[in-house]
Amino acid sequence: MSGAFNNDGRGISPLIATSWERCNKLMKRETWNVPHQAQGVTFASIYRRKKAMLTLGQAALEDAWEYMAPRECALFILDETACILSRNGDPQTLQQLSALGFNDGTYCAEGIIGTCALSLAAISGQAVKTMADQHFKQVLWNWAFCATPLFDSKGRLTGTIALACPVEQTTAADLPLTLAIAREVGNLLLTDSLLAETNRHLNQLNALLESMDDGVISWDEQGNLQFINAQAARVLRLDATASQGRAITELLTLPAVLQQAIKQAHPLKHVEATFESQHQFIDAVITLKPIIETQGTSFILLLHPVEQMRQLMTSQLGKVSHTFAHMPQDDPQTRRLIHFGRQAARSSFPVLLCGEEGVGKALLSQAIHNESERAAGPYIAVNCELYGDAALAEEFIGGDRTDNENGRLSRLELAHGGTLFLEKIEYLAVELQSALLQVIKQGVITRLDARRLIPIDVKVIATTTADLAMLVEQNRFSRQLYYALHAFEITIPPLRMRRGSIPALVNNKLRSLEKRFSTRLKIDDDALARLVSCAWPGNDFELYSVIENLALSSDNGRIRVSDLPEHLFTEQATDDVSATRLSTSLSFAEVEKEAIINAAQVTGGRIQEMSALLGIGRTTLWRKMKQHGIDAGQFKRRV
């Protein structure tokens, strides 16, 4: 080929001319070697990889050939390497091309067959037509080839659509025909790709919705259920498949707050509500999201199960760490408390802890909770002084909402599955005492402004510093509630009667302060002895306060007698004077009788506790009581 002209003088495109220049360096025009052909496993692998393109492309070629027959031509589908994957067309034409080596699996690269549209379309990325002596190889001068490249959704070359015919059969419409087929196949590939991507996203979304802890429901503008995940179906006791397409109001009785929000297309966030499904009430915390569109408003509803919301809240608010292991074991009075505390932990009955201010009733309550089978559940502490007014009833026992305010779980409901610690039970409002009695006796609670019963499973531990029996007689405390709480009563002796536990309490407090202040703390023996001998009218709380102040003010972390506050010596002197007067005015028998009477008053006349408190056997105690004419029954609390 001389210059850029055919033998007849027609000009050729730069694309073809450049191809000729490359081919001149690689091959001879006169020779023709049958092109390399992929066969067997290799061809099958290529075919599988292009399955999507072939499925669409073959259908398009069949449609095109049906329109073109009986024209002498052949239609090809090639991959991005110019390997023939599929052929269709006139049998005689296919046979002639096959004789040249153009079969399924044949590689039509430029380096093999020379300048030809089959390879140039892939190289240039555009539609190309070559005919007659535009081909580099003379064996192809009797043929015309048209080819248009195919691209995927990301713009990458994925194949070629080609047409081949004898040169005398070619027409001006051949190249546009391959272009039209290629565009059709490309559009179908794009549609399939987008559909596959959409399906993939839908599968991911469905997997996400099914793996959520929350239930998810959606319904259209007509109120017909469109989607419900397994969690929502389980919570609402619905058949997910059978419920599809049905009206949401046919499946459920919606709470008033939700009905109002739907009517106003108003969103809700973490609102407590109650559904009725299959004649059962179902509590849930809901979030509603309206989707406002031109054709109407559809909705997505999230169901946050109350049980999980309780667990979430109590995991942050309802954990305590004090156990019986933290209590000193050296003192017999403390060992007695641990013994009765463990009995209380094994029991399901309410527990009443009695004793002076500051004796550690709250810590004993925590130890009972952590020893019980409810240790993994919440521990909710309530100071009843705050609930002396019935106006706070809603916070204590809850109330059903009919507006758009966020619902809030009551203190009783928060304790579900765990322990409810009621500090200073004597201050609880009379109206709330009835609600508490209902929880203890029946295991249910009735909210304010509601008729339904809510199951509540709690262990009640109450404390008091008052004489509840006297309050009952004065009609200031519920008689029935007193009976319920009095079933398991533990009296905690004041610290002055548990002096043996003071060294352990002091050391435990010092170790705790060491961790807080990151320093070493120690106390001299004489200073500790002085602390043991003090009266401690404020009990454990006063002792801890003194130790903390001493730790902050001590020199180099050492607590000496000289560091002790003066009021401790004053209290000790007062106690010494009282003891001296007692010893001079009373005989030993009178002192013994007074000690037994004091023990009976503290323990309510319970022999076993009196025996432990006095440090003598029950037989000895019975003998001495008989000797002094003391009747334990007269000290029992009567209502």
From Swiss-Prot:
Residues annotated as domain GAF: 52-189
GO CC, alphabetical: protein-DNA complex
Every PAS domain range: 203-265
InterPro entries: AAA+_ATPase, GAF, GAF-like_dom_sf, Homeodomain-like_sf, HTH_Fis, P-loop_NTPase, PAS, PAS-like_dom_sf
Molecular function GO terms recorded: ATP binding; ATP hydrolysis activity; cis-regulatory region sequence-specific DNA binding; DNA-binding transcription activator activity
Superkingdom of origin organism: Bacteria
Gene induction: Represses its own expression. DhaL and DhaK act antagonistically as coactivator and corepressor of the transcription activator by mutually exclusive binding to the sensing domain of DhaR. In the presence of dihydroxyacetone, DhaK that binds dihydroxyacetone has less affinity for DhaR and is displaced by DhaL-ADP, which stimulates DhaR activity. In the absence of dihydroxyacetone, DhaL-ADP is converted by the PTS to DhaL-ATP, which does not bind to DhaR.
Residue ranges constituting the Sigma-54 factor interaction domain according to the UniProt record: 327-552
Alphabetized UniProt keyword annotations: Activator, ATP-binding, DNA-binding, Glycerol metabolism, Nucleotide-binding, Repressor, Transcription, Transcription regulation
Sensor domain, as annotated region: 1-318
CDD domains per the UniProt record, alphabetical: AAA, PAS
Residues making up the signal peptide according to the UniProt record: none
Residues annotated for ATP binding in this entry: 355-362, 415-424
GO biological process: DNA-templated transcription; glycerol metabolic process; positive regulation of DNA-templated transcription; regulation of DNA-templated transcription
Known partners and oligomeric status: Homodimer. DhaR forms complexes with DhaK and DhaL-ADP.
Function: Positively regulates the dhaKLM operon from a sigma-70 promoter. Represses its own expression.
Name the UniProt record assigns to this protein: PTS-dependent dihydroxyacetone kinase operon regulatory protein
Annotated source species: Escherichia coli (strain K12)
Organismal lineage: Bacteria, Pseudomonadati, Pseudomonadota, Gammaproteobacteria, Enterobacterales
